[in-house]
């Protein structure tokens, strides 16, 4: 059995009120088009054809070489859009799935079941339908007394009886590929919209006594077509519930799943504890036994097992096992933390590698640095890495002790086991096993405070 797919992605999406093409709006971190394309892969199509139109280059860039593309210059209806794909699929034997690119909730399992139903019933066309609580706006499925599908009626063309029908057309179909394009040559624009309706091919098949069937979705949510921001928010809510439920089934604990945002490509190992208001985005991986506390935000990062992240932001970073971060820390892109590193409150790290068991507990900036293992970085330490034009590197050796309020002016190297005195400004190499003091000598002038205007003795 050979399958093909046509994805309709040419529309502008006027009701979205956006410069972005409708199918490129995101749901849980992926564009709607990407969600649809991933689900389509479940039927293993020999060839996928995406129909593009409005801002076509932007849409094409999302799928790149994963799909063939055809251009619909004028948007003259769904039937017209499918006609554009004939140049890619003409004369091929097999079954063609037609699906809209704005249906992000459709699952691969449902599409696979649709194809199987179509093949097993030897249909020339199969419509994916659903039972809608409120069918207004949808095309209605009209059946005869034997339950056979005889036609699909659009909302604007439906009579009073047809408008009461609850079974709706989801806009997804499977056709015999050759018969699809033969039938499309017979449809017209004689309807309320003045467009070529893809649904008109059903009546053509019925007139020829060819078999048309309908496969009913189990979950109405999968039928959602996103036409405005309200529907986009609905899709986001449903997708978020799916994602959190999937992780819970796989052994992840959520204290308040309704407040958590996790994108589609995030991976979470078992026995992770996630508190409320946590955000996980991009290609993030969370290792087993890790705890993410309230307010943590992580994007495109790897967190090792048994780590504890407390109310902190982590971007494009790699953390080994047993790391503790926060509260209120910020790990910026390019950060690597080895095992059992501790990054404490109000510490910022950027584009730096920090060795095992090193600690930076408070109020510190580490940028463009290579820090060894078992280093203590005192509170208030700053790596001065930028001169206004270029960034420079700081290298700190193993077991070094950086005193509080040290200012390390890069490029700089501090050797193994070296110590910088608190309050020092260091601008030259510190050899291994050295102590460096880079501050002015304290001068004490006894009794001088009595000369100051605010001294208590002056108010008498």
Curated annotation (Swiss-Prot):
Catalytic residue positions: 362
Signal peptide span: none
Residue numbers binding Mg(2+): 102, 227
Coiled coil (residue ranges): none
GO CC, any one term: cytoplasm
The keyword Transferase is annotated on this UniProt entry: yes
Alphabetical keyword list: Acyltransferase, Cell shape, Cell wall biogenesis/degradation, Cytoplasm, Magnesium, Metal-binding, Multifunctional enzyme, Nucleotidyltransferase, Peptidoglycan synthesis, Repeat, Transferase
Cofactor: Mg(2+)
Region (Linker) location: 230-250
Cofactor annotation remark: Binds 1 Mg(2+) ion per subunit.
Pfam families membership: Hexapep, Hexapep_GlmU, NTP_transferase
Enzyme class: transferase
HAMAP family in alphabetical order: GlmU
Name of protein: Bifunctional protein GlmU
Source organism of this protein record: Streptococcus pyogenes serotype M18 (strain MGAS8232)
Encoding gene per record: glmU
